[in-house]
Every structure is written in C-alpha cells, then in structure tokens.
Regions:
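Non-catalytic substrate-recognition and accessory regions of acyl/acetyltransferase enzymes
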Residues: 1-86, 93-171
Length: 171
C-alpha cells in the first residue's frame, strides 16, 4: 500500500566519511554503495566540498537512498536530498543511475511524500525505465500506469491508498 505523507522541506545531510564501494562518478559527484544481503544504501558525495575532522577527510553528503530487499525487489525506504542541492533533480537521476548501473528492480516506498510521487511520475516518462504496478504484492493483475500531473494514475486500479505496489526496472 502506498500512502501519502508530508515531510519538512529543509534537510541538511552534513559531512561524513565516504562509506561503501565507489559505483560511479556522475554530475560532479561520487556515488558510493554499501550493500548487504537484505539492505543497501547509496550515498552521493560532493567531491569539491570537504573538511578534515580528526585527520580524516569528510565530504558533504548530497543525497542518500536507503533500500531494503522485499518480495524480490529493492524497496525504497528513504530518499533524502540536501536542501543546498535542490532543483538539480538529483533524486530522479539517482534512481535512473541505480536502475541502470546495478540492474535491480525498485519498489516504491509504502509512504510517499509529494516529492516521492513526483519522482515516480517522472520515472514513468523516461523511455529507458519501465514502471508497472501490481494490485497487491503477490497479485497477478499488472497495470502500466500513466503519468499524471504530479503523480501516477492507474488504468485498472487506484495506486494510492490501496494495497497496490509500484515497481521500476531499466528497460
């Protein structure tokens, strides 16, 4: 079930040491992935903004994507983007990058903010990404939702406030 939520607009992700393996360098940032069997975190660091704390190099965290394994797909638990980097559509780019580079299937989070619904709406507009929905996690009823003004619109069933699950895979 995907429900609508509201979050505060200001986010400061701060400085931290780079964690995980470097999986790519895009848009002037380093993208690192830390993965276990059931969880994965993807961090985006600004290469140009850093400071030294106790003789260790700490870079500014630009974006964070937290994923957990559920029903054969990677469930989006949390995506955050630092307020200083607003307007660059980093979350959209990060979703596409993760889908293409890691070759995984993403499953929409069970609670989505306005920004989260917008990200999935823009993913559906991309020709290199296939977005589909199931009436339930184990359902055989599959729908290919259309893009709406700000959120996806299902053809066969309501995507929000029901038990529907939304997925994205690189085409």
């Amino acid at each position: 079930m995907v429900s609508r939520i509201e979050l505060s607009k200001g986010v400061n992700l701060g400085f931290e040491e780079k964690e995980g393996d470097l999986i790519g360098r895009r848009w002037g940032y380093d993208i690192h992935c830390k993965k276990s069997a059931r969880e994965m975190s993807v961090n985006v660091y600004d290469r140009t903004k850093f400071k030294i704390v106790a003789d260790e190099l700490h870079h500014r965290t630009v974006a964070y994507l937290g994923l957990s394994k559920k029903n054969g797909a990677w469930h989006v638990d949390l995506v955050e983007e630092d307020s200083r980097y607003k307007g660059k559509k980093l979350a959209n780019k990060l979703y596409r990058f993760v889908l293409k580079t890691l070759g995984i299937t993403l499953m929409a989070g069970s609670s989505q903010s306005v920004g989260g619904r917008y990200i999935w709406n823009t993913l559906a507009k991309d020709r290199n990404v296939t977005v589909y929905a199931k009436k339930g996690v184990y359902s055989n009823v599959v729908d290919f939702p259309k893009t709406g003004k700000r959120e996806l619109v299902g053809n066969l069933f309501n995507l929000y406030e029901t038990k529907a699950a939304i997925y994205a895979v690189a085409a």
